[in-house]
Amino acid sequence: MIEKVKQAILTILQNKQRNGDVLPYATSIEVAHLLKMNALEVEKIAQGIEGIVKGKTLNHEYYYE
């Protein structure tokens, strides 16, 4: 499941053509929808994937590689 989440994250980020590979909560929702999972489950798995680090801003939490 970790590999599926990682691949979904990378696919969505490539589709968005983002710089810095940011995974805001909205992307977590997109990954969850794609994999038929809960967004919180996606975020918990994403935290455990090497290279994805949890960070915070004033408005949202995010993950990045």
Named regions from a protein language model:
Residues 1-34, 40-65:
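Surface-exposed, interaction-prone regions with an acidic/low-complexity signature
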